[in-house]
Every structure is written in C-alpha cells, then in structure tokens.
Amino acid sequence: MIATTRDREGATMITFRLRLPCRTILRVFSRNSLVRGTDRLEAVVMLLAVTVSLLTIPFAAAAGTAVHDSRSHVYAHQAQTRHPATATVIDHEGVIDSNTTATSAPPRTKITVPARWVVNGIERSGEVNAKPGTKSGDRVGIWVDSAGQLVDEPAPPARAIADAALAALGLWLSVAAVAGALLALTRAILIRVRNASWQHDIDSLFCTQR
C-alpha cells in the first residue's frame, strides 16, 4: 500500500507498506473443514517458493560483491598495462574499401587491415581494426600491452558494477525461476487432483439419485 504524508516542514513524504496475506495463510492452515488438503499443500509450496527466493537475496548480493572485486582488479590491471599507440596501415592491396562492398549487404563500420607500429623501439606488425576506406599509409589508433603486443581497449572501471549487478540478478532470477516452475508444476498437478475429486463426487451424487 502507498501512503502520502507530510512532515512538520510541509514536505510530502511517500511511504510504501507491504502487507502479507497473514489472514489467508492462517485460514489455510486452520482446522476449517472447508479447507482441502490440496489447498494446504499448495500454500506450503507457495511459502517455500517465496522463502527460498527471499533467502537467495543475500547470497546473490555476496556473489555480486565477489564478482565486483574480481572484475575491478582485472580492469584496474588492464588500465595500468594497456596503452594507446598509433599504427600505420601497410599493403594497400589488402584494404577493403567501403565502395567495393555489395550494395545488398549492410554497411560495415569496421574492417581489418595489416599495419605496423613501434613500441619501445621495436617494430611490430599485425591485423588491426580500421574504418572502411582506410588506405595504405593511413594511421589508426590501437592499444598495446607493456610488451607491445596488440590488445583490446581496456574496459572502463564502471563495467565492474554492471558485471556485479548482472551476476547477482542472474543468480536470483535463476533460483526464483526454478522455485516458480516448481510452484506452477505443483499447481497443475493439484488442479488435476481437484478436478478428479470433483468428478468423483459428481458421479457419486448421480449414482445416489438413481
């Protein structure tokens, strides 16, 4: 339930209240003769599903924290050991121009071209990413490690937060999905049991009237 109140200074405050169906739960587990055994079993499975989902939250948070610490270390190491450099495109025949691509194909945003670069006085060469239309002699920006080897651009440190959130959410959703699937399966089975019981009672009623 959402309630709106005002403090002494006149500021509006919105509060949220979560009300659990305590009366319904107590009624299900009471000795009421109208409550069937299948109703009690369904309530037990539902409570277990909710309990397991809630108990998974701290474990998911712990997993997210572990992922955050691990990825933060990795990304910090990348930021320290990877450096930008400039490579010169070589071998013009190997360059694919954007005008030579098929008209039916989607436009390409990157191509791979041969290039060479110098780090710490040592010349190296390899395939680097470039824009379509890049020609021999053009310069492109690359990232290299301490040894001068070509590497990917270092990930931003903020990505560790996203990785942690995805890990925690993925773990919780997996457990919640399993709990929900078991609850749905239990409900489907109990519905068949109830229908069979009702059919049996109806058949018995007709037999009695005859």
From Swiss-Prot:
Topology of this chain in the membrane: Multi-pass membrane protein
Protein location: Cell membrane
Listed transmembrane segments: 43-63, 165-185
Induction line: A member of the dormancy regulon. Induced in response to reduced oxygen tension (hypoxia) and low levels of nitric oxide (NO).
Entry-linked InterPro entries: MT1774/Rv1733c-like
First-listed, main subcellular location of the protein, grouped into a coarse class: membrane
Protein name (database record): Probable membrane protein MT1774
Natural source organism: Mycobacterium tuberculosis (strain CDC 1551 / Oshkosh)
